[in-house]
Amino acid sequence: MLDRRTLMGGILSMAGSKATGAALPGRRLRVFVATLGTETNSFSPLPTGLDAFRATMLWRPGEHPDFATEATGPLWAARERAREGRYEVIEGTCAFAMPGGPVSAQAYQLLRDEILDQLRRAMPVDIVAFGLHGAMLAFGEDECEADLLERARAIVGPDVALGAELDLHAHLSQRLVRAADVLVAFKYYPHIDYVERARDLLDLLERIRAGEIMPTSSLFNCQMVAGLATQSSPMKELVADLFEFERRGEVLSGSLIQGFRAGDVARMGSKVLIYTNNDQPAAASIAQDFGRRYQAMASIMKGNGPERSFAADIELAKAATAYPVILVDSSDNPGGGASGDNMALARAMLDNDLVPSCIGPIWDPLAVQLGFEAGLGADFSLRVGGKVGEASGLPLDVRGKITGLAENVTQNLQGSRPPLGRVVCISTAGLDIIVSEIRDQCYGPDMFRALGVEPANKRYVAVKSSEQWRIGFGDMGRSVIYVASSQQSSIRHYHKRSRPMWPFEPV
């Protein structure tokens, strides 16, 4: 059966067609933008309901603050063009939750339908652009993004240009690709390019609406899942080559989707998505070429071959001679849906005299409350962490001093300010433990500095993160050691993911 793009081919090539209406001189494009997303960890004990969205992002039309966020790049880019007189922007709800467990059916349906009702009221429009993540799962719906896009298409019809920006840790499927005219994912990890990719998305949607291009896609399944930083070789060169294909015009858009291994769904995995201008054989060939190169490099990259034991990680840290050493507790990263309250690394730092040092953020609202009750300077016994679930492990009983208290602490994330709420620093035996009221990962040193702790003066700096910490720390660390404190991979039991998939099975 011919898909919508094939049927549109004749229409797009006709002079004076309806699609060319977007290019009429003097007319601003009517553009609807909204956001709905989270990154769902199927194994997280943390429920994701409406309160989780309220705690992170639940901005109704007109409430989006005057800065860009990872989740709302399309809205920000559309506002830029509205200021230039090019767009009439109709803003929908922007909703995003800190990664956790599956979204409740009630929360997902309420937010989805709220956005779709806003779209109905906005009609007629020329363009619909969503900020999505790509790895959002809800009870009763394993493909939230495709579901939203399909329902949006039913509202706007075939002639409106419809697309979305995705995180590169998305789960891609043919259903999701078919649901949009074009999908554009971040190219960098850490995620530093969400505004640029949102601009790319809008450029493509404008050209689609004007009838200038007909994106034709190919999706290559790498049969693996590998999270690779893009600032170092060989991934750096692969991304650069993809940009070069786009610059030359051979590719309209290309996305290297790394996938998210904590999502237990059939579509989970690393994939390559390529769009060409009505040239499917070329799209398939280019997607396969990049996919094969990605497969070849994965096994030599961090975190994708045989993992060191936690004990070996600590021995490696003890052997360091250049400081500070950044200890990255990626297995307990709140940015991947973990609780952020596993204390194994903090305990090991104390037991092995890895001091002077600091660690954070540890998520423990009760410990924060008790720390504020005790007050600044108090000598205090406090049980920290180990509260949420099996992966949290044992709590750490700390006898120390409250050396820092701060309210309304935020972190700088490329201009946006994700909150940590009230934060406590408890110092014991040379280790400064940063405990936060709101769960989030570490994006940089300002989290420590808000409590009077200077990471540059420490021998060891332990962060609850995976790669996003690099945004703020830059090259502060003389060496970087990735540790696996919670051993979460050992307690994951997949039921839905495809098989075989490397590194779980040989391919």
UniProtKB/Swiss-Prot annotation:
InterPro entries: MlrC, MlrC_C, MlrC_N
Domain of life: Bacteria
Keyword GTP-binding appears in the UniProt entry: no
GO biological process: proteolysis
Cofactor: Zn(2+)
Cofactor note: Binds 1 zinc ion per subunit.
Regulation: Inhibited by the metal chelators EDTA and 1,10-phenanthroline.
Pfam families from the UniProt entry: DUF1485 (PF07364), MlrC_C (PF07171)
Signal peptide: 1-21
Keyword Protease recorded: yes
Residues annotated to bind Zn(2+): 167, 169, 191
The entry's keywords: Hydrolase, Metal-binding, Metalloprotease, Protease, Signal, Zinc
MF-aspect GO terms: metal ion binding; metallopeptidase activity; peptidase activity; zinc ion binding
Family statement: Belongs to the peptidase M81 family.
Function: Involved in peptidolytic degradation of cyclic heptapeptide hepatotoxin microcystin (MC). Cleaves both linear MC and the tetrapeptide degradation product of MC. Cleaves the Adda-Glu peptide bond of linear MC heptapeptides.
Protein name, entry field: Microcystinase C
